[in-house]
Amino acid sequence: MKRLALPLIFLSLVALACTTAAQDVAHSDTGYLNVRDFGAKGDGQTDDTAAFQSALDDMAKQGGGVVTVSAGKYLIKTHLAIPRGVTLEGTWRAPASATEYHDPKDPKGGPLLIGSVLLAVEGAGNPDGTPFIYLNRNSTLKGVTIFYPEQTKTNPPIAYPWTVATVGADNCSIIDCLLVNPYQAVDFGTRVSGRHFIRNLYGQPLYKGLYVDMCLDIGRIENVHFWPFWTAADADSPVAKFMLEKGEAFIFGRSDWEYVTNCFAISYKVGIKFVRGRADGPFAGGGNYLLTQTGADCCDMAVLVEETQGHSGVSFSNSQIFGDIIVRDTNNGMVRFTGCGLFGTEYEKNGVALADIAGNGRVSFDNCHFYVIHRDLKNVKNMIRVRSGRISITDSLFVNYWDAPYSNNPTLLEPAVKAAIITNNEFYGKAKITNNALGRVVISGNIEETDTKPYPLWKKPARPKEEPGAIVVDDSDGAPGVVFLGEWGLVENTYDLNIGYYRGTRWAWKGDGKSRAIFKPLVPKAGRYTVYAYFGFDPASDHATNAPVEIRSAEGLRTVKVNLRPLKGEWVKLGTYRFSAGRKGAVTFTNAADGNVLADAVKLVPG
């Protein structure tokens, strides 16, 4: 019996230790569990689905908390569901990108990814299948990278289900995540998604990026950046072509309200798309979106509006938008652009250089600037075409002025336009507005050709007349009459600024005399001449009080110092000297002074 007792005691202790260890794994007093404690390997080969889901479910049973994911590559062969009140958290504390576009150990393979990486493989060829990760009420996905290792860089790429989606719950969050190459990234629209929160999300969605719909309480989206980094190292990538043909970065349906801040998409067919809600009742109709510092670049359609909420609509402010703005005839809501830069597209697919507007809603541009950045558009006649509805363009700038059809006729109002207000705008070129509208129209207060003909009321002056026999050399005459050495600036006269004698004046900063302006009048006959120099007024009170003027004549060299500050634009007498015939004499201005100096004109009067 004694011999049997010891083994039994040993086995009992082992069983107790195992039970205690299992209890330690299953319970956390700190609110944290780690997937490796549940058997996750993170080697990129072992299926870690069960370990992840066990950790998530155990955390939910304890009332919620954080399941951490150590650095590694975790193969998830099916999908995950993050329960209520649980956060799945990786190592990242900010959105990441690929460390290198290609892993040096596998140049033809995928990117080099570090941190907490989840490898998604389920659902190839089934875009309507189960999402890779479901979020429940008050659940969060944070600090992870998700990569599809079996995705192909083809046109089309392999279709997969959504990467992250809500189960139909409020308060779902995505923070500090990188979705490398999802076919469809985030679905907060197929099911209810009120008060969702997305911050610091990076990725290259191939077909659809972020879809929002069925949100009856304010959603918030911050710092989302979609760009083609996965294909950046592959010249002429077929995937990049697919994105420009089919890709939609942001799809916004029914939301009441939605705040969108610091978001960006580049190289998609549609950058930001507003659509009618997919459901009926309170979920019907368009959305109400406020977008700040949010835009799209290199897109066929940077903004596509199919429908917005009738009484609220959408508003862009302080945003840059590269690509066409298209408002369909299905839209009845407001679309506002305030303080935005609008640049058009290079693709010529939409029949306009910058915007095509229809529908029954009001589209307004206030304090914006329009600049068709691609000069080679050959097949478009207008910058902005308004087919129907309402348009307002106020206090804005049209930059284009070169000889192109869309520059010569920047705005077209077609007959079905109900109301148009185009006032107080500046056009660098022609301000031709073709008004065929049958509705009420106000076009007033616009100014045109401010770059091609900047001073239409100012006529270039004739050369001033002086005393009979006077010899005048102006700073605009050029050699051999005048030569400038060192650094000299030029201020030209305008219709409201006459600072110089004829066309303007040269000036130089105070210095050591290395800036020299040498005026050499052509004297027809030897004799005595009174020398004058012209000085303009002092607009900045920084002119010299001792500006030196050297007069070299047949009598030798003499220097006269002039106080420029009280002068109002006048000839200053420098003395009478004997000059030989020809260009043997000179009057020289230098910057060896206590302030800025002028060199404008010199006059010799005989007698």
Model-derived features: positions:
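Bacterial N-terminal signal peptides
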Residues: 7-17
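Feature marks extracellular polysaccharide-active and adherence modules
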Residues: 70, 77, 83, 89-91, ...
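Extracytoplasmic
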Residues: 456-607
